[in-house]
Design a protein with these regions (language model features):
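Flexible glycine/acidic-rich beta-alpha junction loops that bind and position SAM and/or redox cofactors
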Residues: 211-215, 235-272
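A short, structured N-terminal alpha-helical element that caps or precedes a catalytic domain
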Residues: 1-55
Length: 272
């Protein structure tokens, strides 16, 4: 059979990588984002604006909450589909925060179990990307770190929850080799006490700052200043993509504020 896989994912798509592995195991020919006639076409869509209804089987966050059949979900990803040089997968899917601005609660994936990295890691790689939505909610999070240390892997990740940070978790982060920045987040002002306590003990990293949701400009400036004072770098996440939010993001990304005594003074002078 000739199988075509379609997606609007800009980098990689784990579901399609597993579908590819499944069909290649049956000696099918697999193509990615080709145009033509095929025996079967799968599509996984991330964005609402993408054209739908052009594949035999469609899924993904922009379509529905459907999941892969067990026989496909259990496959190791086909890393040749995107010519990746790192492993990709989940050791723990859930995040129990239920934040209204986040898509994770809406997806509501039924898999709540811990998984070993060896369910998806290819030992030929020395890097691994964890797609976990909240690693430290996993009661067995230590096992994940121990497997990574034993395999001497460099880690890419989607962020660690500062509200769950204690000395033990912070020490695990310090012992881990990361590729690029470690990522954290400060979305809500009501979490300030726990966020600041976490930022004081974790390794230096990049902190996602949600703006335009339920915070004021004054609170956005305040959060960025606190993050900088604790030797981390803020990274603005515009919620509504408004002109003001995008301008504030450009301001923080420009690092021109480093020339000033504080963020507030720099923002007053920012003209772009």
């Amino acid at each position: 059979m000739n199988i075509n896989l379609l997606t609007d994912a800009p980098k990689h798509n784990l579901a399609l990588m597993k579908i590819s592995a499944y069909h290649k195991a049956m000696d099918d020919n697999v193509y990615l984002n080709w145009v033509g006639m095929f025996d079967k076409t799968y599509a996984s869509w991330l964005y609402d604006f993408t054209m739908k209804g052009i594949a035999s089987v469609e899924g993904g966050p922009a379509v529905d909450n459907s999941i892969l059949p067990p026989e496909i979900e259990s496959m190791k990803p086909d890393y040749t589909l995107y010519n990746l040089d790192f492993s990709l997968g989940y050791t723990f899917r859930p995040c129990y925060r239920g934040c209204l601005f986040c898509k994770v609660p809406k997806m509501n994936h039924p898999d709540k179990e811990h998984h070993s990295i060896w369910e998806f890691h290819d030992p030929k790689f020395n890097k691994i990307c964890l797609l976990n939505n909240n690693t430290f909610f996993d009661p067995r999070w230590k096992e994940t770190f121990e497997e990574i240390w034993d395999a001497r892997l460099a880690v890419r990740e989607h962020g660690f929850d500062l509200r769950l940070i204690d000395e033990e978790r912070a020490d695990a982060l310090r012992k881990t080799r990361f590729e690029g920045d470690i990522h954290y987040a400060w979305d809500r002002m009501e979490d300030e006490t726990k966020i600041l306590a976490g930022l004081k003990i974790v390794p230096q990293g990049r902190v996602y700052v949600l703006v335009g949701y339920d915070t004021t400009e004054e609170e956005d400036l305040y959060r960025c200043q606190k993050i900088i004072d604790l030797k981390h770098n803020p990274y603005i996440m515009p919620f509504n993509q408004s002109k003001r939010e995008k301008r504030f993001k450009r301001f923080i990304d420009s690092f021109m504020w480093r020339k000033y005594r504080n963020i507030k003074e720099a923002w007053k002078d920012y003209k772009v």
